[in-house]
UniProtKB/Swiss-Prot annotation:
Catalytic reaction(s) noted: 2 reduced [2Fe-2S]-[ferredoxin] + NADP(+) + H(+) = 2 oxidized [2Fe-2S]-[ferredoxin] + NADPH
Pfam families: NAD_binding_1
Protein name: Ferredoxin--NADP reductase, apicoplast
Source taxonomy: Eukaryota, Sar, Alveolata, Apicomplexa, Aconoidasida
Residues involved in NADP(+) binding: 174, 272-273, 302, 313-315, 341-343
The species this protein was found in: Plasmodium falciparum (isolate 3D7)
Length: 371
């Protein structure tokens, strides 16, 4: 009898201990998960800079379309944005999305190249490097190698240059290319999306993801007449074209009507290789002509060299105008935007930090999107 009692008691105690351990384990797991959530959430908040990102409308636009569920659109126009003496090849694409692609100025869209080819070409074979090779037609009509089309679908992101009140969406895309080595000297290879973009024609289908990013204007920029400094290299000018169209209520059907109440001051530092490489030149000249008291543009050409034969870049121009630049940022309370090659970020931040009063409050006025 005693043995049976001891056995039952031991079973009960072990059960309680087991339950206690399970409860403790579940509590610990919840605490760990909660801590992880807080860490990620806090990091996410810091990355997003919620000063500008608390717009509910904007949050509804983010990732509305994904790689698994993209939006099928049509190319309605394709324009070469550079002139003959530019070493680059850059296209402006105008895309009809039937009003379905929602975005704010400063957002990016993703383009999925070869969307149909990845599924519908029976001659595609996968090699060991997980690239797709077309066994019947290794190059397309423009002699562009297809060996770099990736098996796994992914999108390349491009800044939107149109305003969200316009019928069509537009982007500027630089074509990246490089020559094949001695094995195939007559073949030019293109970047993952570049070959696809180069071959696009009007009325072709194109698949978009997005909208993406948080490189946007303050919600109250027009009401408060916020001053701005825009720094760009190459295609980094695209979001600023979008910003200008928003701030000045641009209407391509009524170009000479001033419909905006915005009276702030905008300084643009734009670095490109030479004069023929300026993107959206017509738009920039239009805004400067229409609003001469509101816009000042500094073009910086890298083909011009310093005395030591090194190239002169946009960050060098800003350093040369350091006093003027810091005066705009500190005394005119400008919101500073940096978009383009990642090298410009460090030099500009060094200039800002050289001022004794560059604190966390001012840091919140700096917005960066580099590549």
């Amino acid at each position: 009898m005693k043995i049976r009692f001891v056995f039952i008691l031991s079973v009960l105690i072990s059960g309680v201990c087991c339950i206690s351990k399970n409860v403790s384990r579940r509590v610990a797991n919840r605490m760990t998960a909660h801590s992880r959530f807080l860490f990620v959430h806090d990091k996410y908040k810091r990355n997003k800079n919620f000063k500008l990102k608390n717009n509910k409308e904007e949050n509804n636009f983010i990732n509305l379309y994904t790689v698994k569920n993209p939006l099928k659109c049509k190319i309605v126009d394709k324009i070469n944005l550079v002139r003959p003496n530019s070493p680059n090849e850059v296209y402006h694409l105008e895309i009809n999305h039937n009003g379905l692609f929602k975005y704010l100025e400063g957002h990016t869209c993703g383009i999925i190249p070869y969307y149909n080819e990845l599924d519908n070409n029976p001659n595609n074979q996968i090699n060991k490097d997980h690239n797709i090779i077309n066994t019947t037609n290794h190059t397309n009509h423009n002699n562009i190698a297809l060996s770099h089309i990736k098996k796994q679908r992914c999108a390349r992101l491009y800044s939107i240059s149109s305003s969200n009140n316009m019928e069509n969406l537009s982007v500027a895309i630089k074509i990246h290319k490089y020559e094949q080595t001695e094995n195939a000297p007559n073949i030019t290879n293109y970047g993952y999306c570049s070959g696809f973009i180069k071959n696009l024609k009007i009325n072709d289908d194109i698949y978009l993801t997005g909208a993406h990013g948080y490189f946007n204007l303050p919600n109250d920029a027009i009401q408060k007449n916020t001053n701005f400094i825009f720094i760009a290299t190459g295609t980094g000018i695209s979001p600023y074209i979008s910003f200008l169209k928003k701030l000045f209520a641009y209407d391509k059907n009524n170009l000479y009507n001033r419909n905006s109440n915005y009276t702030g001051y905008i300084t643009i530092y734009y670095g490109v290789y030479n004069e023929d490489s300026i993107l959206y030149l017509n738009e920039l000249e239009y805004f400067q002509k229409m609003y001469p008291n509101n816009i000042n543009i500094h073009y910086v050409f890298s083909y011009k060299q310093n005395s030591d034969a090194t190239s002169f870049y946009v960050q060098d121009e800003i350093y040369k105008r350091k006093t003027e630049f810091l005066n705009l940022f500190n005394n005119y309370k400008c919101e500073l935007y940096i978009c383009g090659h990642k090298s410009i970020r460090y030099k500009v931040m060094d200039i800002l930090k050289s001022h004794d009063q560059f604190d966390e409050k001012k840091k919140k006025r700096v917005h960066v999107e580099v590549y």
